[in-house]
Amino acid sequence: MILAYIQTSIMSRRCMGEEVLLVENIQIDDTSPPGGLVSIWTLNRPNKLNSLNSESHKALKEACEMAESNDLIRVIVIRGASPIPPLEGKRAKPASFAAGADISEFLGKNSDDVRDFFEDNAWERVWKLS
């Protein structure tokens, strides 16, 4: 089996000018059936250790919908973006898949809003992909 690069598509979900989830689809160049695509999803908030905010959750849900509607996708790999190199004299941030929830987003919100955020779980949709 040979993997051949065919396309890169970036989810349109942005947070403060950055794409929070990058989606890359790679063609499986295989002469035997079924062929198809490997979809690589990169959590792209390295300055926040790829922590998940509401925009990340929305992007993951959109990516799940895209994957469910594309019968060519055979495998999904989810990874975290590499850390940004530190400024001179600053300590480097550690590499991470995802640091968890970005709790800074909950400042000033009431407990009902926070509970709603966690009840509408994007990871549950990821686990249910078929």
Predicted regions and their residues:
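Short beta-strand/loop segments at the ligand-binding rim of alpha/beta enzyme cores
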Residues: S130
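Conserved CoA-thioester-binding segment of acyl-CoA-metabolizing enzymes
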Residues: I2-A92
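Glycine- (often His-adjacent) and acidic-residue-rich active-site loop
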Residues: G80-W127
